[in-house]
Amino acid sequence: MIEVRRISEGVPLDFEVVVREGEGVTRHHVTMSREMCERLTASRHTPERCLEAVFRFLLDREPKESILGRFDVTVISRYFPEFERELAHYLWRS
């Protein structure tokens, strides 16, 4: 289960993301600009929905314990070049 909570309306937007899988729980502090969210979602989804999709994408590629504890969404493409291209599939999945 992925829980996304917005903790700041500033620039960039600031979130706490909690991932519960199996026995464990991880917490992540994630930032994302409004512009990045609009680009990733074609302005069709909320930032919270965008981050849920981001974490589903990441969890398909690595265990929750390997996801950075603190990061900006822009760094994901450094590790996974396919990120922006593939994210749409995760946004439209229920």
Where are these regions (language model features)?
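N-terminal intrinsically disordered, cationic/polar leader segments
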Residues: 1-41, 73-94
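Acidic, aromatic-enriched beta-alpha/helix-loop junctions
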Residues: 31-64
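Residue-level signal for secondary-structure boundary elements
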Residues: 62-66, 88-91
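Metal- or metallocofactor-binding catalytic centers and their adjacent structured scaffolds
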Residues: 69
